[in-house]
Curated annotation (Swiss-Prot):
This is 2-iminobutanoate/2-iminopropanoate deaminase. Pfam families: Ribonuc_L-PSP. GO terms for biological process: L-threonine catabolic process to glycine; lipid metabolic process; mRNA catabolic process; mRNA destabilization; negative regulation of translation. Keywords: Acetylation, Cytoplasm, Hydrolase, Lipid metabolism, Mitochondrion, Nucleus, Peroxisome, Phosphoprotein, RNA-binding. It is found in: Cytoplasm; Nucleus; Peroxisome; Mitochondrion. Its main location: cytoplasm. The modification Phosphoserine is found at S136. It comes from Homo sapiens (Human). GO terms for molecular function: 2-iminobutanoate deaminase activity; 2-iminopropanoate deaminase activity; deaminase activity; mRNA binding; RNA binding; RNA endonuclease activity, producing 3'-phosphomonoesters. Belongs to the RutC family. InterPro entries: RidA (IPR006056), RidA_CS (IPR019897), RutC-like_sf (IPR035959), YjgF/YER057c/UK114 (IPR006175). It comes from the Eukaryota. The keyword Hydrolase applies. PROSITE patterns: UPF0076.
Length: 137
């Protein structure tokens, strides 16, 4: 059996890891993107303006990682959204649909006790590299 190729994806246009993990890992055509918070990559600080601005920055960071892997948001097939307050769910949805416009990825959303650096939101994703064709059932 031939081995699959595993490659670390990294870009300076998204925040560096704040622990022992990679921004993303590509295995074959599947990209596993680590959770992104609303951290400005140049300052290393959370953006101000509450959960909406943090969500925008987290998704912008994710977009840069996707771009580094030769992808965009249309390649994303699954996301997990972690919220410090589940009452922010509707606000986050309004931001989320600015980045995911159709053929939405599968998703789970959870309220958690705390997030890194006091963030209000963290989003992780799985994407498939290369062209994708949407089939109708």
């Amino acid at each position: 059996m031939s081995s699959l190729i595993r490659r670390v994806i990294s870009t300076a246009k998204a925040p560096g890891a704040i622990g022992p993990y990679s921004q993303a890992v590509l295995v074959d055509r599947t990209i596993y993107i680590s959770g992104q918070i609303g951290m400005d990559p140049s300052s290393g600080q959370l953006v101000s303006g509450g959960v909406a601005e943090e969500a925008k920055q987290a998704l912008k960071n994710m977009g840069e990682i996707l771009k580094a892997a030769g992808c965009d948001f249309t390649n994303v097939v699954k996301t997990t959204v972690l919220l410090a307050d589940i009452n922010d769910f509707n606000t986050v949805n309004e931001i989320y649909k600015q980045y995911f416009k159709s053929n939405f990825p599968a998703r789970a959303a959870y309220q958690v006790a705390a997030l890194p650096k006091g963030s209000r939101i963290e989003i992780e994703a799985v994407a498939i590299q290369g062209p994708l064709t949407t089939a109708s059932l």
